[in-house]
């Protein structure tokens, strides 16, 4: 049995299949961790969702910001942008089943035996592991409820950008969602910056990548994340693994085998755009 962790798929179904073929992935014995953003930008979001859902219990995934945006579009809240290439999915006969499955997926995965944590954007240095899990569960509970469109309608926005246990209501849910699915940079005190997207060597001071600010989780766990394609999987400290290598932008789809830390890559079918 092996555990494989794959970065943002973004509708790149054929690259996903080729990557799994490289290691002869066996859903009966192997486990597959996915960093989120299964959909959007790539050509085959529908096929990706159908495939991942059909894999069943061998998959441990987390939701990404593009997955959440899909839920909002489905609910009539977000805008279906042409560049996201979601129309085939939204018009599919099984879209209701796929959406109801997707919105019940977690925002964080933790394996205490492996001391492994996965979240789409990472873990804010303002949280310990218990807080990260509790905040993720709160968002998951709302997404899994019948009132999830009310949350999605209030999800968009950059504030609040600093964690406090006293945060409540939609503000608390928005902070947690941003920290788990959108974060890239933080101020030295751990406050989130939701504007900067450039590579770290071009970031305006005093901003730092979240993973360069020590926190309780990064001290005790390996953190695996996606979301930040321009990193190209490079530049993170030991114990922090970025797996989004921009497949939908003409980069690669990357996969880590946990047991021996071997990396596998599958080049994109598209020309490089990064």
UniProtKB/Swiss-Prot annotation:
Under CDD domains, the record lists: MPP_ApaH (cd07422)
Q: Do the record's keywords include Transmembrane?
A: no
Q: Which UniProt keywords apply?
A: Hydrolase
* Enzyme type, top EC level: hydrolase
Purpose: Hydrolyzes diadenosine 5',5'''-P1,P4-tetraphosphate to yield ADP.
Entry similarity comment: Belongs to the Ap4A hydrolase family.
Q: What protein is this chain from?
A: Bis(5'-nucleosyl)-tetraphosphatase, symmetrical
* Species this chain originates from: Erwinia tasmaniensis (strain DSM 17950 / CFBP 7177 / CIP 109463 / NCPPB 4357 / Et1/99)
From which lineage does this chain's organism come?
Bacteria, Pseudomonadati, Pseudomonadota, Gammaproteobacteria, Enterobacterales
Gene name, per UniProt, is: apaH
């Amino acid at each position: 049995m092996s555990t494989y962790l794959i970065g943002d798929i973004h509708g790149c179904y054929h690259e996903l299949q080729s990557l799994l073929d490289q290691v002869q992935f066996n859903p009966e014995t192997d486990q597959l961790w996915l960093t989120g953003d299964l959909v959007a930008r790539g050509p085959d979001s529908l096929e990706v969702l159908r495939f991942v859902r059909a894999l069943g219990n061998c998959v441990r995934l987390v939701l990404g910001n593009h997955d959440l945006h899909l839920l909002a579009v489905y609910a009539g809240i977000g805008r279906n942008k042409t560049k996201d290439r979601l129309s085939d999915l939204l018009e599919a006969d099984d879209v209701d089943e796929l959406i109801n499955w997707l919105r019940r997926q977690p925002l964080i995965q933790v394996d205490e035996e492996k001391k492994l944590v996965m979240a789409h954007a990472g873990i804010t240095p303002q949280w310990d592991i218990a807080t990260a899990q509790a905040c993720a569960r709160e968002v998951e509970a709302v997404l899994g409820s019948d009132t999830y469109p009310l949350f999605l309608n209030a999800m968009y926005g950059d504030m609040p950008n600093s964690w406090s246990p006293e945060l409540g209501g939609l503000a608390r849910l928005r902070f947690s969602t941003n920290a788990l699915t959108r974060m890239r940079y933080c101020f030295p005190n751990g406050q989130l910056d939701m504007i900067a997207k450039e590579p770290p060597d071009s970031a305006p001071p005093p901003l730092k990548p979240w993973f360069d600010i020590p926190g309780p989780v990064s001290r005790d766990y390996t953190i695996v994340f996606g979301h930040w394609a321009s990193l190209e999987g490079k530049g993170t400290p030991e114990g922090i693994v970025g797996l989004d290598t921009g497949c939908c932008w003409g980069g690669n789809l990357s996969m880590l085998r946990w047991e021996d830390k071997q990396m596998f890559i599958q080049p994109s079918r598209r020309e490089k755009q990064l």
